[in-house]
């Protein structure tokens, strides 16, 4: 039924009611019915327009995929980035437990790697590209009892840059495992001293980085992964 026919029916009904109604009460009833009829027609017309222009009601099937057009590219980007391997230089080398009296770094191990241009040359990591790098290293010392003289343990990360010839210390730490004051207190008890170094630095292509200690005889190789050295490009 069209809107024009609905309005025509309402007008005819109002005319009939006006003929049948008599006096003031009839006029008031006719006015109320007319107002109710007008609101009913207006509501029906509004509902018809909303349905006709698709403002309300179920969406068309061809419009559903468009609702996700702004979401799909983001999801696809996240999925593709998670699959794309990083091309940034990275290295993680571990100490050789078979090298007695020295700290020798190895890359050919299951828990070590050299990737995207980083090289291990003469026990030093060679930087392949300019940029910011996270440099880190850890060593673990152990001993049995304390000697008469204090034991000083040092761990240092140095840089030999291509722009200037002298070696410069980037990170350094020193520890003493023995703090007893009398021989009676210096019993033959085992001690352990870890030293961790880490920081972010601007490096140049060709820079050589080394991680060194002063007391290699105290290194603890009992467990794999306790002594390591690495860089990560940021």
From Swiss-Prot:
The soluble form derives from the membrane form by proteolytic processing. The membrane-bound form is further proteolytically processed by SPPL2A or SPPL2B through regulated intramembrane proteolysis producing TNF intracellular domains (ICD1 and ICD2) released in the cytosol and TNF C-domain 1 and C-domain 2 secreted into the extracellular space. Coiled coil: none annotated. It comes from the Eukaryota. GO terms for cellular component: extracellular space; plasma membrane. InterPro entries: TNF, TNF_alpha, TNF_CS, TNF_dom, Tumour_necrosis_fac-like_dom. Residues 89-234 form the THD domain. The record marks 34-35, 39-40, 49-52, 77-78 as: Cleavage. A lipid is attached at residues 19-20 (N6-myristoyl lysine). Cytokine that binds to TNFRSF1A/TNFR1 and TNFRSF1B/TNFBR. It is mainly secreted by macrophages and can induce cell death of certain tumor cell lines. It is potent pyrogen causing fever by direct action or by stimulation of interleukin-1 secretion and is implicated in the induction of cachexia, Under certain conditions it can stimulate cell proliferation and induce cell differentiation. Induces insulin resistance in adipocytes via inhibition of insulin-induced IRS1 tyrosine phosphorylation and insulin-induced glucose uptake. The TNF intracellular domain (ICD) form induces IL12 production in dendritic cells. This is Tumor necrosis factor.
